[in-house]
């Protein structure tokens, strides 16, 4: 429950830790579903997730607190009105400072439905990116997915020649014992209430990414809130 970043009558935003799946998979094990009862905060029903985050991606995850709230959030996501910003540390990096990746994506094979590949016949997929800092063969990117395909940011970065650091599927990281996927859902902005300003929520950089994010030039606050100097 300490991971709750925002709460009101309709919505929760939590800081999902890396390594925790959102939904149960065929292998079983611990998932976010096991913790939803602790996030009811007095309501009779458990909240439900309004979108996906990969198991190894950390950061902002939006939940609706009851059926009407979930329907409202689903509508906002369907209309592409929720602004999502990710931070990623990539190997190498783009030559420019900002741009777009417009590459259609499709499942890699029928038996690995959640592994994706670039495919001109696939679903249109668009990512906007901006370089925030660079250091020794690494680049910190701000990524904004305009579409929301499975593994979109990971495949788009890999196909552009700069895979996300710590990615064991699309990058160069080993399956076990790597540095951890350096992809973080940094912020969400949700126009939940028509007559009020959008709700903006930010998740702190996770521990496994702090060293390389700071090396790329970002002045991160220390856990007690002070800057690094």
Predicted regions and their residues:
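Loop/turn elements at beta-strand to alpha-helix junctions within RNA-recognition modules
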Residues: 67, 146-147
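Short histidine-centered loop motifs in beta-beta connectors
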Residues: 136-144
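Short, acidic, Ser/Thr-enriched surface-loop or helix-capping motifs
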Residues: 119, 126, 145, 192-193
